[in-house]
Regions:
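Solvent-exposed loop/turn and edge beta-strand elements of beta-rich ligand-binding domains
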Residues: 1-230
Length: 230
């Protein structure tokens, strides 16, 4: 019994909490140590966060001190609780019977970990083609929009490459972006009116890292045509 009830044996019990992710059974390990720092038991949490050690039976009266700590196995994305919990078991001899009681220094008796996958970054690109004339760096402008709001405006380089600043994603989600050319007024140029929709799906890879994947993002090409005015 881990909460102060009387018996000749004690099963120490604490609680595991996890922030940022659903706690799974056997996700974390915990050690029970005696006052000489010897590891007596190692157990894992259940699906409800309960951490229960096997009962210790006492044959003699006395005071017994224990330390409970979590094993930091460095799982990616997790921040571990470095605190230790201290418990004192007092065993009394009453009329020949051993009666044990438990007292924890910290009444909460909890270990709290947190999980946060590292952010993902993704750079969207496109290509600019100009028929009828050599393309120049900075000649045309392009917009990256989300829900009608312009996030970035960039221009092509001398090879027609279009690169938007990297997008940052901090959680699992699905977002839709639109890439289009900003209509200009260069004489003799017929602008490409097309807009391309790109869907980005962000997933946790289970190793502490978010991964962003774009669909319909390959081979986005804007083609303008130049015809010299008569």
């Amino acid at each position: 019994i881990g909460g102060g009830a009387k018996s000749d044996e004690v099963a120490l019990e604490v609680t595991k909490k996890l922030e940022g992710k659903t706690l799974e059974k056997d996700a974390f390990s915990f050690q029970l140590l005696d006052d000489q720092c010897n590891v007596l038991q190692t157990v894992k949490n259940d699906e409800n966060g309960k951490v229960k050690f096997e009962a210790i039976k006492y044959k003699e009266a006395g005071t017994f001190k224990y330390t409970i700590k979590e094993v930091n196995d460095n799982k990616p994305g997790y921040t571990y609780d470095a605190n230790v919990l201290k418990a004192t078991v007092t065993v009394e001899d009453i009329l020949g019977e051993k009666l044990a009681s438990v007292k924890f220094e910290d009444s909460k008796k909890e270990f709290t970990n947190s999980y946060a996958a590292k952010e993902a970054k993704l750079q969207l690109e496109a290509k600019k083609v100009l028929n009828g004339k050599a393309i120049e760096a900075g000649q045309f402008e392009f917009e990256l929009k989300e829900n009608g709001t312009v996030l970035h405006t960039v221009s092509n380089d001398a090879n027609g490459k279009i690169q938007f600043p990297k997008l940052t994603f901090t959680k699992e989600e699905t977002r839709t972006f639109t890439i289009s050319e900003k209509a200009g007024d260069v004489a003799g140029v017929e602008y490409d009116p097309n807009a391309y929709e790109v869907t980005v799906v962000v997933k946790d890879n289970g190793q502490g890292q978010l991964v962003a994947t774009a669909s319909d993002a390959d081979n986005i090409t804007f083609t303008n045509v130049y015809k010299a005015e008569p």
